[in-house]
Amino acid sequence: MAFEKLGEKFSNFFAMDNEDDYQDQEDEQAQQPAPEQPVDNHYRSNKVVSMATPAGKTAKIVVYEPRVYSDAKEIGSHLLNNRAVVINFDRIGSDDATRIVDFLTGTVFAINGEIKRVGESIFLVTPANFEIDGSLASTIDSDGLNLSSQH
């Protein structure tokens, strides 16, 4: 008799014949509404940058004299923050100056900006919200970037 009760307990414990209990639990879960989570409709992307200057805010132009190639990253950061940069390459070698101009050419392409040579070793680099007007053809050599007079 004791073994029968023990066997009955094991069979009740491991048996799947109590499906009604299982369905009741499932029904209770289905009837409970899912907790509401606030919907965030804000677009989260760091790739989208507003290029418009807010009303009343002064646009900035940064003057920069790079001394090493790694300065190109800082100049690029100014462009991404909607600041125009005037770059004087007098204090850097022509190879590094050429590399910086190449880097900045790619940067201004990506942000729809412009890069213009305004002097023998001076460039103006602007983001999309600036407009460069005029020409300095008399100061620009026909062979493009000529920084051979550099150190």
Curated annotation (Swiss-Prot):
Belongs to the SepF family. This is Cell division protein SepF. It comes from Lacticaseibacillus paracasei (strain ATCC 334 / BCRC 17002 / CCUG 31169 / CIP 107868 / KCTC 3260 / NRRL B-441). Residues 17-42 are annotated as: Disordered. Cell division protein that is part of the divisome complex and is recruited early to the Z-ring. Probably stimulates Z-ring formation, perhaps through the cross-linking of FtsZ protofilaments. Its function overlaps with FtsA. The keyword Cell cycle applies. The gene is sepF. It holds the Pfam family SepF. Residues 17-29 have a biased composition (Acidic residues). Homodimer. Interacts with FtsZ. The keyword Cytoplasm applies. GO terms for biological process: division septum assembly; FtsZ-dependent cytokinesis. Keywords: Cell cycle, Cell division, Cytoplasm, Septation. It is found in: Cytoplasm. GO terms for cellular component: cytoplasm. Disulfide bonds: none annotated. InterPro entries: Cell_div_SepF (IPR023052), Cell_div_SepF/SepF-rel (IPR007561), SepF-like_sf (IPR038594).
